[in-house]
Amino acid sequence: MLLGVNIDHIATVRNARGTTYPSPVEAALVAETHGADLITMHLREDRRHIKDADVFAVKNAIRTRLNLEMALTEEMLENALKVMPEDVCIVPEKRQEITTEGGLDVLAQQEKIAGFTKILTDAGIRVSLFIDADDRQIQAAYDVGAPVVELHTGAYADARSHAEQLKQFERLQNGAHFAGDLGLVVNAGHGLTIHNVTPIAQILAIRELNIGHSLIAQALFLGLPEAVRQMKEAMFRARLLP
């Protein structure tokens, strides 16, 4: 199982004081060195954390893959074609949200998403759609030609009871298997921590987890190398459990 380290909140800390540090590039290189299989960045329309220059700098510096999260807009499409990341994950985006609140509604935007997917694919960029674990959305993702889906784990991560968490886990598990049966590559992410990642990492249909906020939070106390190492180890151990 692969670990994508999202470095958005390195930029959040930097931007809080308008300094040049901490450096997203340095964070990406440290994460790679200590177990990250790819680097994920979300260039939001409001540029609240990652800036355009960060994306180019990280793309040019890293040795692994860059997974660029972006909204379904012409501006972001143009940016992606300039940066040429290995992967683009199309996500929903609202100006006032603190973080991504739900999955992309592929059903409601099939024609536009299909167009973006074709343009990016023709350019050699693999496309992923960040969606809820809903069979209709998964089927729609397949229908528009996206080769990858990333299942939104937020409802699982935010569950306030064991029963609710189990319900959301089963939804993710079923969705991952449905997507896998369609031939889609299945990733997952949002709200995952060292404390809740094990069940998700045990879903064999899921190939990659993208984790950011909790890793950066842990890094405040442990350092980024140890935070990445511990997360990678937790994922690896989960795969070994019966």
UniProtKB/Swiss-Prot annotation:
- Identify the species of origin: Neisseria meningitidis serogroup C / serotype 2a (strain ATCC 700532 / DSM 15464 / FAM18)
Q: Where is this site: Transition state stabilizer?
A: 150
- What is the name attached to this protein's record? Pyridoxine 5'-phosphate synthase
Binding annotation for 3-amino-2-oxopropyl phosphate: 6, 17, 191, 212-213
The entry's family comment says: Belongs to the PNP synthase family.
Question: Catalytic site residues?
Answer: 42, 69, 190
The annotated subunit structure for this chain is:
Homooctamer; tetramer of dimers.
Major localization listed first in the record, in broad terms: cytoplasm
Among the GO biological process terms of this entry, one is:
pyridoxine biosynthetic process
Q: Where is the signal peptide?
A: none
Q: In which pathway does it act?
A: Cofactor biosynthesis; pyridoxine 5'-phosphate biosynthesis; pyridoxine 5'-phosphate from D-erythrose 4-phosphate: step 5/5
Instruction: State what this protein does.
Output: Catalyzes the complicated ring closure reaction between the two acyclic compounds 1-deoxy-D-xylulose-5-phosphate (DXP) and 3-amino-2-oxopropyl phosphate (1-amino-acetone-3-phosphate or AAP) to form pyridoxine 5'-phosphate (PNP) and inorganic phosphate.
Give the Gene3D superfamilies listed for this entry.
Answer: Aldolase class I
Which gene does this sequence derive from? pdxJ
Keywords linked to the UniProt accession: Cytoplasm, Pyridoxine biosynthesis, Transferase
- Could you read off the lineage of the organism from its UniProt record? Bacteria, Pseudomonadati, Pseudomonadota, Betaproteobacteria, Neisseriales
Task: Tell whether Transport is among the UniProt keywords.
Answer: no
> What positions does the entry give for 1-deoxy-D-xylulose 5-phosphate binding?
8-9, 44, 49, 99
Question: CDD domains, alphabetically?
Answer: PNPsynthase
